[in-house]
């Protein structure tokens, strides 16, 4: 779910990935007008904005991990008029970034309360700080020059498992309490790939003795 429920609609983003089960089905099989049987949303990842609250929030996402963050950020900034949000978002390049236009629009709407930090792994940038992947080393580097991680009341992390594990460890090391760090894991194991295996067996003669007989 990638939009705030306050808009009265439910929008779901699906990014097809190599070996993905549902993502490939959604891309190739689901068509406009189809009726789908769905369950209620699962898990406890998210945040319920409170109009009277003034908070500082952090989101760390990579790739399609931006999906729940967009809903959380837009709902929080719309409801909590004095709260601030920082998004650290990792992608291969600006062209591969999901919701690039939506994020730009959100930044234009809340220029003083939303900070966007984009990290690109396959795009040449003037600053080495913004080049590479989001990992523990990158977050510690950001802490030295650009981001005060101790200021945040809540942190939300979503993306590849390795990134999430390193980000969680880095935030703890940088002073954030564990209870303030929330993770969303939605990856599933890839579909097993069938392989043809050739086995070459050399003939061997074996004598088996049972009850004294060969």
Q: Residue spans of the language-model regions?
A:
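Reductase modules of NAD(P)H-dependent flavoproteins
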Residues: 95-214
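Short, charged beta-turn/beta-strand-edge "cap" motif at the junction between a beta-strand
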Residues: 40-45
